[in-house]
């Protein structure tokens, strides 16, 4: 058996902060796992260092399920974003080790490929509708079949999804939370115009997506979904805060626009009702936030029973280690829908060399043993941690709103 003899965390900031767990075995094989929790990275790093790593030493690295249960049930204070990100890092690293020892890519260990590649969607955004659609046209020319559209809301600077750079979006970029303003009324008036213009310019063949980012009440979300029906969206994401899962029932009753939610979910219990009652069409839980490949595979199987497909979160707050793991997962499940894909900075790609490649609107994880993603520790050390917060939002009257 490959025995775990050491493990360590690597914190680096090649454009944004990432926490990577490296697990070493007595056979000389190591595995990597992503433990990044956007804006709270050091909390997970401390949890791993102080509470998880000491419990791993001497264990059989092949016993992935048992180690997962040990870390989940054994901590008593189960679930939550910090605990589940730490468990995810361990789980992902163990799958990486297992694949390397077997000489197989992880997707082969998960049952083999169900498709030739993983359809991904890019992010097109801009201060104006024309600017957003100009950027969308670039993605279409690059071969993307699915594109998320976000645009500025008139009279509101710093709207969610509008980046400072044309294609790189890093919202966690300030030493203290940046304050933005929000008006639901202006947003509801302007958003349908974006998609009307998009269909006129981009045609009917592209899949179009939109992220509300938890900002609407259920009835407001129902109204927006109804207004967007003529433009046949692939999905409307995070239409309302999902703490109350039953709130999606009201939205579902009023619109046929497909609904997606789940990037902030940490376990199957956060979305059990949503899936069981078919209140959503896509579940967006991802490897690093939902306990790793082991738990996400179970969640996807449960979703498959209820005709819910996956659409894993894949923004740049996840490192290439997580993206690689997500692609192996995506390739292996029958109910895959789409994978979010935001390109990392060149500095990040240099720190995390990877085997996955893009072609014709799809990513493929490659056939290197394990995850096919590595880390250059010397280069990572040149990019020290930098504290960074996500923005916050206030309504026009000064009260707090969901960002």
UniProtKB/Swiss-Prot annotation:
Family in the record: Belongs to the mandelate racemase/muconate lactonizing enzyme family. GalD subfamily.
GO molecular function, one term: mannonate dehydratase activity
Keyword Magnesium: yes
Free-text function comment from the UniProt entry: Catalyzes the dehydration of D-mannonate. Has no detectable activity with a panel of 70 other acid sugars (in vitro).
Annotated source species: Caulobacter vibrioides (strain ATCC 19089 / CIP 103742 / CB 15) (Caulobacter crescentus)
Gene3D superfamilies reported for this sequence: Enolase-like C-terminal domain, Enolase-like, N-terminal domain
Active-site annotation: 160 (proton donor/acceptor), 213 (proton donor/acceptor)
Residues at which Mg(2+) binds: 211, 237, 263
Pathway(s) of this molecule: Carbohydrate metabolism; pentose and glucuronate interconversion
Listed cofactors: Mg(2+)
Sorted UniProt keywords: Carbohydrate metabolism, Lyase, Magnesium, Metal-binding
EC number from the UniProt entry: 4.2.1.8
Binding site for substrate: 38, 123, 263, 284, 313, 317, 340
Keyword Transport recorded: no
Disulphides: none
GO biological-process terms attached to the record: amino acid catabolic process; carbohydrate catabolic process
Signal peptide: none
NCBIfam families: ManoateDhtManD, PRK15072.1
Catalysed transformations (reactions): D-mannonate = 2-dehydro-3-deoxy-D-gluconate + H2O
Cofactor note: Binds 1 Mg(2+) ion per subunit.
PANTHER family reported for this sequence: D-GALACTONATE DEHYDRATASE-RELATED (PTHR48080), STARVATION-SENSING PROTEIN RSPA (PTHR48080:SF6)
Protein name: D-mannonate dehydratase CC2812
Record site: Important for activity and substrate specificity: 315
SUPFAM superfamilies, alphabetized: Enolase C-terminal domain-like, Enolase N-terminal domain-like
